[in-house]
Amino acid sequence: MHVYIVRHTSVVLDGNETCYGDMDIDVRPTFEEEASITRAALEGLSFDGVFSSPLQRARKLADFCGYGFATLDDRLKEMNFGDWEGQPWAEIIKDEPVDQFFARYIEGVPPGGESLMMQYARVRDFFLEKRREGYKQILVFCHGGVINCARTITGEVRLVDAFASLPGFGSVTRLDFTHLED
């Protein structure tokens, strides 16, 4: 199964200043300009399935690119940072052991949230299910963390290294799940 996986365009919050994952935040005023580049990158491609995170930043891009009919799936949401969602990183660092969390981020769970391993498991479940259902080429609108989990599943990166480089906003990544084992 071949997958074209699209990261949403930039959002109104700065992820270097504010913690956001599965928080449903809006896109920036530059959305149409950014989304036009993504739409052009998808021109001429065909898919036997189109899926999207239900978060508005992914749904809006799917709609703009002509895929407003995409099937929404919660497994495609960004990592849930729980009580940290929407909080300034400066505050989290003051009140929470953030350095400890990032030192053990694969298994570490933010208060009320999920670990990277939990996110990885749900993302893997999604892609394995789609492959079992017989899809040959799908399009997915989602988030940087989901894309990095998918890259880990296909063996492109190790999970421990997955967040060293997030794909750019509005980028399209092509992955091959053909030889993936259940």
Q: Language-model segments: which ranges?
A:
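Domain-level recognition of soluble alpha/beta enzyme cores
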Residues: 155-181
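Active-site-proximal alpha-helix that buttresses catalytic centers in soluble enzyme cores
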Residues: 6-65
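Active-site signature of alpha/beta-hydrolase-fold catalytic machinery across serine-
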Residues: 64, 149-153
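Phosphate-handling substructures
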Residues: 65-122
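Short beta-strand scaffold positions
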Residues: 52-53, 121, 141-142
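GST superfamily/GST-like fold recognition
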Residues: 144-148, 171-173
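Short, hydrophobic/glycine-enriched beta-strand segments
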Residues: 2-8, 140-141
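Glycine-rich phosphate-binding loop signature in dinucleotide/nucleotide-binding domains
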Residues: 43-46, 130-136
